């Protein structure tokens, strides 16, 4: 049985998701908070972050060599270019290159600003120069903007395919779920800290390490599901597949 194209292939992504979440929970339970943070989050240099980068980097050649899209050559090239752009920006984010570039260009602004400059409050601050804001806007446009545009383009097709148990749609759904988990775990410590009126160093170490494990682990899961969706789509469709790329 080919796991990519069988009638039960839609179950592959959820099974991987459950196994991944269970593994992350186990790792969090057995590791000390400080050791876990060192292994998962060291500004792009930790073991897990370094291991995640090839997953995102592999998306770029894979989407061109195993094109999952149908239609004209121009359409396929534009969609592959969009996927490549998002994957490249994901590598930039994982390695914290965007923060390094901002720090190099505007060191005084970054030093005075509490937290990362890649936040909405950075854009709304009156003390931040227009050039620095433009860099942040460009980052958001290339990463989240292109991703959102592609998601909206395929939203109706993916929704129909999801309820028809299409493997690609379920892999994309798990990818989206991983992305939501990453954002939630990134914000959760700050939300909880503000709600309790605590200082940053008063957040319980176990809670902080839990969020770190699922945030960084979720980024690897996201990349893995993207690779799986590309492989499934390429395996399922013939060279003359329909223009929408999903036969639903």
Indicate where each model-derived feature is located:
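Polytopic alpha-helical membrane-helix bundles and their juxtamembrane interface segments
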Residues: 2-91, 99-102, 106-247
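An anion-binding catalytic pocket shared by soluble metabolic enzymes
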Residues: 94
